[in-house]
Design a protein with these regions (language model features):
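Noncatalytic alpha-helical scaffold of FAD-dependent oxidoreductases
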Residues: 1-244
Length: 244
């Protein structure tokens, strides 16, 4: 919920309309949760995710550690075009990414000097290699991909684990969606898959540079009480989009 366009709500950094840069420093001001659990939720009705969000933020005694949404289309793009990112982070960790990005940039600079090499040479090589890698997602996630359009990865800690588990069992006993509690492998896979979504879109553009004009990021501010949050673009715009 943002109020930059509402002068009545201007206070300090709020409503600065780009005239002020705000920096935040993350400090270890509270102990890390010793007990955490990740719940993978699937549904074909966005109202069910809205109910879960409102309950978690308004009724739970323990707030979620995180909540990550994935649409089926994004799931599919990341599955194909984020596979190598998934494996790199799984094997080497995120701390190695800067070195790998630097190597990628050097390869691309070299590729530009060699006339017969294609544009985005490194991306196309890595995409070819990723096709040779084994399947990286658990069967449970693939089953949910086939059954449900909307996915939510909900991470809880401490007392919130039992609280969320009890709520989800009760809620989905009377609704069309479902959930499962992730084991260690599923937890890692779900988080890495969600992480790979953004880079997968960039990879898709690079691999299909003869088809895709560019990426468009839509940053949409919603009111706190909006229940209908799923984007519905005008037909004249929607029919020009390859994937979203």
């Amino acid at each position: 919920a943002r109020f930059n366009a509402d002068p009545a709500r201007h206070y300090e950094a709020s409503g600065c309309a780009g005239k002020l840069m705000v920096f935040a420093v993350r400090l270890d001001t509270f102990p890390q949760e010793k007990q955490t659990a990740v719940f993978y939720i699937g549904t074909n009705d966005i109202n069910e995710l809205t109910d879960i969000r409102r309950a978690a933020l308004g009724e739970f005694e323990s707030l979620p550690v995180s909540g990550e949404y994935i649409h089926r289309d994004a799931f599919d793009i990341a599955d194909v075009y984020g596979k190598d990112t998934f494996y790199v982070i799984k094997k080497f960790g995120t701390h190695q990414l800067p070195k790998l990005f630097d190597l990628k940039a050097r390869v691309d600079r070299f590729g530009k000097k060699v006339s017969f090499l294609p544009k985005h040479f490194s991306d196309k090589v890595m995409q070819f290699v990723s096709k040779l890698l084994p399947d990286h997602l658990p069967k449970s996630m693939r089953d949910y991909r086939d059954k449900y359009e909307h996915h939510l990865i909900l991470k809880m800690g401490g007392k919130g684990v039992d609280e969320a588990r009890a709520f989800l069992k009760e809620y989905f006993a009377h609704h069309g969606g479902a959930f499962f509690e992730c084991n260690a492998e599923e937890t890692q896979a779900a988080m890495l898959h969600r992480f790979a979504v953004a880079s997968a879109a960039i990879r898709y553009r690079a691999v299909h540079d003869d088809e895709v004009e560019d990426l468009v990021a839509l940053d949409i501010a919603l009111r706190r009480d909006d229940r209908d949050w799923f984007e519905k673009l005008p037909l004249e715009i929607d029919n020009k989009i390859i994937h979203k």
